[in-house]
Amino acid sequence: MSAPDYMQCAEDHQTLLVVVQPVGVIKNENFFKIYNRVSSVCQVNPMNTQRLLSIRYRHQYPVDNNEWGDFQTHRKVVGLICIAECTSARDLPHTILKFEQQKEAYSSTLYDSRLFLFGFQGEMADQSRIDVASYPSYDNCAAVDKRVEDFIQSLFIVLESKRLDRTSEKSGEKIPLLYVPYEKKDFVGLDPDSRHYKKRCQGRMRKHVGDLCLQAGMLQDALVHYHMAVELLRAVNDFVWLGAALEGLCSASVIHHYPGGTGGKAGTQLRQSVTMSADSFKRHRPGAQEVLIDPGALSTNGINMDASTEIGRAKNCLSPDDIIEKYKEAISYYGKSKAAGVIELEACVKAVRVLAIQKKSMDASEFLQNVVYINLRQLSEEEKIQRYSVLSELYELIGFHRKSAFFKRVAAMQCVAPSIVEPGWKACYKLLLETLPGYSLSLDPKDFSKGTHKGWAAVQMRLLHELVYASRRMGNPALAVRHLSFLLQTMLDFLSDQEKKDVAQSLESYTSKCPGTMDPITLPEGLVLPPVPFTKLPIVRSVKLLDLPVILRPQKVKNLLGQKLSTKSPFIYSPIIAHNRSEEKNKKIDFQWVQGDVCEVQLMVYNPMPFELRVETMGLLTSGVEFEYLPAALSLPAESGLYPVTLVGVPRTTGQITVNGYHTSVCGVYSDCLLDNLPGLKNNGCTVEVIPALPRLQISTSLPRSAHVLQPSSGDEVSTHVSVQLYNGETQKVIIKLENIGAEPLEKLEVTSKTVNTKEKFYGDFLSWDLEPTLSQFPLKPGNTATLTVYIKVKLDFSCQENLLQDLSDDGISVSGLQISSPFRHVSKPRVETKPVNQSDSKSSDFSHVKTLEGILNFKYSGGPGHVEGYYRNLSLGLHVDVEPSVFFTRVSTLPATSTRQCHLLFDVFNSTEHELTINAKDNQELILHAGECQRMAIQVDKFNFEGISDAPSEKQNYHNMKEIEEERQHSKGLEINSKLGIRWKIPTLKREGEASVEGVLNQLVLEHLQLAPLQWDVLVDGKPCDCDAIADCKVGDPIHLEVRLTNCSKNAVGPFALTVIPYQDYQNGVHNHELQDIVTFVGSNTFYIGAVQPMDRSVCFGALLFLYTGDFYLDIKFQDDNSNRELPLSWFCLPSVHIRAIDTLNETKF
């Protein structure tokens, strides 16, 4: 035999071989259409018997294999069906002639033959020929199946006659010797009458009859004949035929034990996997459909069975274990003859199929190992491919996947052997793909991210390189790029540094002609190659969605607690948020992005390559919201370690946006990398809410930017910092420019301020503004600007605490000789005399010490769709103010004035600047102070009524202890006094001015002296008030009326009081004359009595006196000392001094 039939299985021994061939020129499509129709008739019940006749069809069969038909009858071509195309009667003779010629090739073994003509429209001239049938077309041939069944019936008749002829031979007749072609020369010269020769003839004929019985469906008879043949042939040591008899016995037993067959689907797969060269593959490929029989349909051997026959069958039939032993024995006998190599190989294949059914893989592997070592004649390349492919399929059948992959790879390499003129790269590529499972290699990159690596990486890399090379030789660059990308992605950890460089360079070379994409590649065989994202080029270790910058972060307007709950709801509001695991799964984070704003995602990436990795583009993959990403390009150093990369984009719609991954372009390969497929990835959440668009506000000021960064204790962040230098008490006007740089109108603006990080005590409002002029320009359209005027007013403590005198003495500076009308009494004193500071005592005594004030101006604004949804933004402006000292009040005291309702405030003012400075109070002349000079300033002021401040009802609600309440009262008193004084300073050379506040300067004693007494006393002479050095004129001898009024401004009732009027004369030399009984006389008593006076009530008492001589007289009104009035302070009983001038009536007439 020339070519082994690797598709053989044990049940083929019961089949009749029919060859179907084309005659003349006929299209393969038409031929195989009819071939499939014919081969579908594979089992027939002949002559209405219970036997089952099985047919095996081939469209190609070597003639030399037919010569082995006597050795095993299933190898004999007993039927021939020819298919021809004949459209006219003129071509019919020529077609029939060719049909006859093709019959000659198998004439020695043919039982019958048929010729099917297609396209013949007329009537055949010779109607007597039953072996020729014509049909109008290939589609209109419904009777083909019936004619094939009739043809099989005729084969059965011949077969049955031959069987009967062989079994009915008489014992005396000479039995012919059956032999195989290579045995002809071996029997020359042998004695045909010898007993040995006769036994050989008998044994071979018994074996031959067994084959015929098996083909005829008589299994029991076949078993009997096989057993007899084995005994006869064993006796004469006819090893090859003994092996055939044993194999026949095994086949009959397999048919009995395994009615489903041993070939089955595996046989189909084997036929389909036969790989040939490019042209021969196309020509012979349809032969894979030569699956002929379904041995499972065999249920009887055609003989009427009874219990005895069942017992006999069980006795003659081999057990499953005996079947394997007999196969081994048969194969060992085959091995004794080199010419029986093909028979030996096919027997091994059949045994393997049986062992596969029995699930005895190790035993099957021994048979397959024998197949490998069977030495056949010089095989063609096509036959080598077929042999290795079948070995691979058989190893796969028994579960030896890696061994199967090995032989399949050998077959693939054989397809492109150097000896082949036209290498079959497509067949090679197909076979290489089929080897992947055997080497634990999948073309899905997801399988390599699940746990540890499986398989031998070195072998897998070699196989992937071969796939790349085969793809390139096939002329499919996209396929080569896909496999090379897969190699680089999945085998990166096993590549050396040089291999990494080489693979990357090759990939860049391939992608320059055909870029790598994320589209799946569908192969002609139907296999789909999934995309290969480069999740390792670079490796991403963490993904973090970043919040917007501080100036752009949206905030939600806070509603009232439970405001959104329905009033009809039965549920009680609770601030406790229920734990929801679905939120963890969604990974939603607690800040928002804004529609239309640039949003950022930070990736920590790592370059595992030993060279600089260039990422041409890198962007985000999102879902849920329309997102416009802004591609980034980066270059990572070799083995860079973790490297931060920020990817940005702009959400164009609102809703929930989920960052699913990122896409890259590396080495010409475009990759979509999903976060779910990244092992060991850390992220802070992938889903964020995108709220409606908001305007963007940009502010700029006339002040320079500050190098000081404000860090409020509250944690607020300040976006812009400016600084300014001011003198204490100075006010700075700042113009803030508000520009809408967004795409939405600015509709709402709120401005607030607060002071931070300062230990200095300041007075008044640090920052003030009027928002109405700015709001009048709203809504502010995109690109428009508005202005806001803000006043920075620094008013720190102007006192020098180290030298603030606690006594109210005049310090030796007399002012009694100055005119009362002058508001300023000043004496220039050296700085040493005033002793403002002992510079060696404290560092804080340095008058030039610069203090710092810091404040934040917060702009809360909104507009557009975001405003409708209740969102706003905050923009903060940080102010750093360096406050230089201007003036200090080193000493403060008071002097009584001529009026009981006035007093003099005395200030020692020190100029701590390096410039000449002027200072003045309201509507008064200026006092000039040189640098470092200290002067005293006296200001006459009306006393203050602090009762309204002291009784403020809301104070106790804002303070926690009495000390705080008292401090606030004192501050309020100082504020009122400061507003009345209006002291201001000015530096003419710098054109700068400011306020000098006395709020922190006045101590409690000074405040008491400035406070208007609760009991207000008024003295009137002849109805005219006597106060402020006023002189009342009267005539000698004329009585004058004296009226004393008391107004009770205290909270309690006072009185009764007794007041005594004592007149005296002042000689202006310190001597007072009280002995005036002969000069002044009273009309009535000189004592006035005032009863109890209720709060806010008034009491008046009247008297009169008479002056008998001219002169200047003074009236001293004193209270009688009694116990009832000692509880009231003496300051409450300050009555004005009364100055009366008595003139002579004659002198007045003369004037």
From Swiss-Prot:
It is found in: Golgi apparatus, cis-Golgi network; Endoplasmic reticulum; Cytoplasm. InterPro entries: TRAPP_II_complex_Trs120 (IPR013935). It comes from the Eukaryota. The keyword Cell cycle does not apply. Keywords: Cytoplasm, Differentiation, Endoplasmic reticulum, Golgi apparatus. The keyword Endoplasmic reticulum applies. GO terms for cellular component: endoplasmic reticulum; trans-Golgi network. Pfam families: TRAPPC9-Trs120. One of its GO terms (biological process) is cell differentiation. Part of the multisubunit TRAPP (transport protein particle) complex. Belongs to the NIBP family. Functions as an activator of NF-kappa-B through increased phosphorylation of the IKK complex. May function in neuronal cells differentiation. May play a role in vesicular transport from endoplasmic reticulum to Golgi. This is Trafficking protein particle complex subunit 9.
